[in-house]
C-alpha cells in the first residue's frame, strides 16, 4: 500500500519533457497541462515547431536536448518512428539514472526503440494511444476517451500507467512480442476500413452518384453499424445477404464485380460466414461457402 502511495506521489510530482513537437507531442502536452501535470517544455530540431508547441501548451521552449533531459523525470519522444532510436542514441550518454523514457509508436517495442537502456539506469516504455491524432491543435480535446496500451520495463510500469489512470484513461499492458500484431489490429480497424469504404464509394459512383452524395447516402449505415459494433460486438451487429445465407443475392453481387473486387468480396465474406455461424448455429452456410470457393 505504501508502495502504491509512493508511486502515486511520484506521478503527481513527475516532470515530463516532450521531445518532438508534432501532432502527438502537442496533443499530449496540452492534455497533460489541462490536467495539471508538470510539463517541463518542448525540444525539437525545428525550433519554430518547439516554440509553437510551447506557446500552445503554455509551457517552455527548450533550446537543446541536454537541458530537457536534465530537467525532466520522464521524457516522451514523440518523433516519427524511424527517428526514435536516432534521438535515443543522442541521449543515451547523458545522465539518465532513474528516468523514464517513453515513445508513442504502436509498432515498436521499448527494447527495439531504446537499445541498451538498462545499462543507462533508465527505464523504457512504449505508450500508445489507441486514437487517431489527426489535428495538432484539437485532438487533445478527445484524448480523455483514448485507451492507452503500455509495454516496457515492469519495474516502474505502474507509475507510467498511473499518469493516465489519474487522468481517467483506461490502460492495458502488452508484451513486447505482441506489439506488431497489436499494431496491425489497430491499423486494420482504423486504416483498412477506409479502403473498404472507398470500394463502396467507387461502386456507388459506377451507379451515377458523385463521391459527395455517395458519402452522404452511406453515412447513416456506416455510422450506425460502427455504433452497434462498439456497443454490442460483431456477432450481434451482423446483417445482410451473407448472414442470411442468401445465395442468389451473393451470386448477383459477384457477377457485378470485376476480378479484383470479387477477390476482396470473397475474402471478406469468408470472415462474415464465420461470424454468421456464431450468430446462427443452426443455419446451413454450405452452398454459400461453395459459391464463394471455400469448399
Task: Please name every model-derived segment.
Residues 227-283, 295:
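Interdomain hinge/lid region at the active-site interface
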Residues 49-56, 121, 138-230, 292:
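Internal alpha-helical scaffold of NAD(P)-dependent oxidoreductase catalytic cores
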Residues 60-138:
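Rossmann-like NAD(P)(H) cofactor-binding subdomain of soluble oxidoreductases
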Residues 21, 106-107, 130, 152-155:
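Short coil/turn segments
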Residues 26, 30-34, 55, 89-93, ...:
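Short, well-ordered alpha-helices that flank and scaffold nucleotide-derived cofactor binding pockets
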Residues 40-44, 101-103, 150:
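Short, hydrophobic beta-strand segments that form beta-sheet elements in well-ordered domains
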Amino acid at each position: 500500500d505504501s508502495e502504491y502511495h509512493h508511486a502515486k506521489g511520484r506521478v503527481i510530482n513527475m516532470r515530463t519533457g516532450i521531445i518532438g513537437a508534432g501532432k502527438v507531442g502537442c496533443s499530449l502536452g496540452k492534455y497533460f497541462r489541462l490536467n495539471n501535470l508538470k510539463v517541463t517544455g518542448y525540444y525539437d530540431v525545428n525550433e519554430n515547431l518547439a516554440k509553437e508547441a510551447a506557446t500552445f501548451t503554455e509551457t517552455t521552449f527548450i533550446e537543446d536536448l541536454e537541458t530537457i533531459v536534465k530537467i525532466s523525470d520522464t521524457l516522451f519522444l514523440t518523433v516519427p518512428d524511424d527517428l526514435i532510436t536516432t534521438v535515443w542514441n543522442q541521449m543515451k550518454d547523458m545522465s539518465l539514472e532513474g528516468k523514464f523514457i517513453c515513445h508513442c509508436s504502436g509498432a515498436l517495442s521499448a527494447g527495439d526503440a531504446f537499445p541498451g537502456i538498462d545499462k543507462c539506469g533508465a527505464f523504457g516504455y512504449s505508450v500508445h494511444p489507441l486514437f487517431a491524432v489527426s489535428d495538432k491543435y484539437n485532438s487533445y480535446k478527445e484524448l480523455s476517451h483514448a485507451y492507452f496500451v503500455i509495454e516496457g520495463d515492469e519495474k516502474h510500469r505502474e507509475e507510467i500507467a498511473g499518469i493516465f489512470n489519474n487522468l481517467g484513461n483506461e490502460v492495458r499492458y502488452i508484451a513486447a512480442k505482441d506489439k506488431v500484431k497489436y499494431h496491425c489490429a489497430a491499423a486494420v480497424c482504423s486504416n483498412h476500413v477506409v479502403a473498404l469504404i472507398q470500394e463502396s464509394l467507387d461502386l456507388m459512383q459506377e451507379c451515377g452518384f458523385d463521391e459527395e452524395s455517395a458519402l452522404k447516402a452511406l453515412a447513416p449505415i456506416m455510422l450506425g453499424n460502427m455504433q452497434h459494433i462498439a456497443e454490442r460486438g460483431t456477432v450481434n451487429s451482423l446483417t445482410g445477404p451473407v448472414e442470411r445465407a442468401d445465395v442468389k443475392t451473393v451470386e448477383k453481387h459477384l457477377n457485378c464485380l470485376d476480378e479484383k473486387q470479387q477477390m476482396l468480396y470473397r475474402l471478406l465474406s469468408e470472415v462474415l460466414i464465420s461470424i454468421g455461424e456464431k450468430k446462427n448455429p443452426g443455419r446451413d452456410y454450405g452452398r454459400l461457402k461453395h459459391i464463394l470457393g471455400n469448399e
